């Protein structure tokens, strides 16, 4: 689904002494099937932005379009329920939202509330489990008896059981160790391509934005600060420093190598291990002193 924000502002407690502009005059487009990273510090407007995508928040000014759905200051569209079935949101620490007696009931909760029949729900669960790295042996277990990582995967399965066309991820790797972060992002990348989704993820991890996103949008104090292809945006060190953000470590690594050895090695979405191997090959080949 195509997504667009046109001059969108959201004002908390408007016309009161506590008025606060969470986002201001945001305009951008997200093409169907793309992966977009939203980056910014706490208070930059990231969470408010993504809450507009399924109508949890309605613009104070401007217009949001998600496919054929339109959200503006006139209020929520009449078919808001349909919109929410098509936009799946995985909030931070989604495992905290588990509540049913069994894993199966938790995953089935959303589809049941949207009138999906039992047979269809069973088929959806069976197809989703491998995608999130779970086996059917967990279905009759209490979600509260699972490990933290398994709980998160169950919560994600519950969102995917709705068969969304848009997947919104709010800090999907929060609280995970480096290995868990890598596994989680690899899983989402696979799901994105397997199900042909439009995916938006909020992140503080510049490496993930560089590796997985087709587009990066950086927010600062509720306004769009930068937008573009990841490599073009995330290598602009001086501009990023204006909003207390750093370039990805892999870009720093390549830039320092190129400066030291007068080379022109270019980042092409390789791992740091592969890049180091290429550097060694060049140096061993005597290309540089």
UniProtKB/Swiss-Prot annotation:
Using the record's annotation, list all stretches that form the ABC transporter domain. Answer: 3-246
The UniProt entry lists membrane topology as:
Peripheral membrane protein
Quaternary structure note:
Forms a stable energy-coupling factor (ECF) transporter complex composed of 2 membrane-embedded substrate-binding proteins (S component), 2 ATP-binding proteins (A component) and 2 transmembrane proteins (T component).
Among PANTHER family, the record links this protein to: ENERGY-COUPLING FACTOR TRANSPORTER ATP-BINDING PROTEIN ECFA2 (PTHR43553:SF27), HEAVY METAL TRANSPORTER (PTHR43553)
Keyword Nucleus in record? no
Alphabetically list the UniProt keywords.
ATP-binding, Cell membrane, Membrane, Nucleotide-binding, Translocase, Transport
CDD domains given in the database record: ABC_cobalt_CbiO_domain1
Q: What is this protein called?
A: Energy-coupling factor transporter ATP-binding protein EcfA2
Q: What is its EC number?
A: 7.-.-.-
Q: Which family does it belong to?
A: Belongs to the ABC transporter superfamily. Energy-coupling factor EcfA family.
Q: Which InterPro entries match?
A: AAA+_ATPase, ABC_transporter-like_ATP-bd, ABC_transporter-like_CS, ABC_transpr_CbiO/EcfA_su, ECF_ABC_transporter_ATP-bd, EcfA2, P-loop_NTPase
Gene name per UniProt: ecfA2
Looking at the UniProt record for this protein, which Gene Ontology cellular component terms does it annotate, in alphabetical order?
Answer: ATP-binding cassette (ABC) transporter complex
Compartments reported by the entry: Cell membrane
One annotated GO molecular function is:
ATP binding
**Which residues of the sequence carry a binding annotation for ATP?**
40-47
This protein's species is: Oceanobacillus iheyensis (strain DSM 14371 / CIP 107618 / JCM 11309 / KCTC 3954 / HTE831)
Task: Explain the purpose of this protein.
Answer: ATP-binding (A) component of a common energy-coupling factor (ECF) ABC-transporter complex. Unlike classic ABC transporters this ECF transporter provides the energy necessary to transport a number of different substrates.
């Amino acid at each position: 689904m195509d997504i667009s924000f046109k001059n969108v502002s959201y004002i908390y407690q408007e016309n009161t002494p506590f008025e606060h502009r969470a986002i201001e005059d945001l305009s951008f487009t997200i093409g169907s099937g793309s992966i977009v990273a939203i980056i910014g510090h706490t208070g930059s407007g990231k969470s408010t932005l993504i809450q507009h995508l399924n109508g949890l928040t309605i613009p104070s000014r401007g217009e949001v379009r998600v496919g054929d759905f339109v959200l503006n200051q006139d209020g929520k569209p009449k078919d808001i329920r349909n919109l929410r079935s098509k936009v799946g949101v995985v909030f931070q620490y989604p495992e905290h939202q588990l509540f049913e007696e069994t894993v199966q009931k938790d995953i089935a909760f959303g589809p049941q509330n949207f009138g999906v029949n039992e047979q269809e729900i069973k088929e959806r669960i069976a197809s989703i489990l491998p995608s999130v790295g779970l086996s059917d042996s967990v279905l009759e277990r209490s979600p509260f008896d699972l490990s933290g990582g398994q709980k998160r995967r169950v919560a994600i399965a519950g969102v995917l059981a709705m068969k969304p066309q848009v997947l919104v991820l709010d800090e999907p790797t929060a609280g995970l160790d480096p290995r868990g972060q890598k596994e989680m992002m690899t899983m989402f990348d696979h799901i994105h391509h397997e199900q042909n989704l439009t995916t938006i993820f909020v992140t503080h991890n510049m490496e993930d934005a560089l590796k997985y996103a087709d587009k990066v949008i950086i927010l600062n104090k509720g306004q769009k600060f930068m937008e573009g292809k990841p490599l073009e945006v995330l290598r602009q060190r001086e501009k990023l420093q204006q909003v207390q953000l750093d370039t990805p470590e892999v870009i720093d690594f390549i830039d320092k190598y190129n400066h030291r050895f007068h080379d022109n090695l270019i980042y092409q979405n390789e791992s740091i291990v592969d890049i180091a191997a290429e550097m060694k090959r060049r140096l061993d080949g005597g290309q540089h002193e």
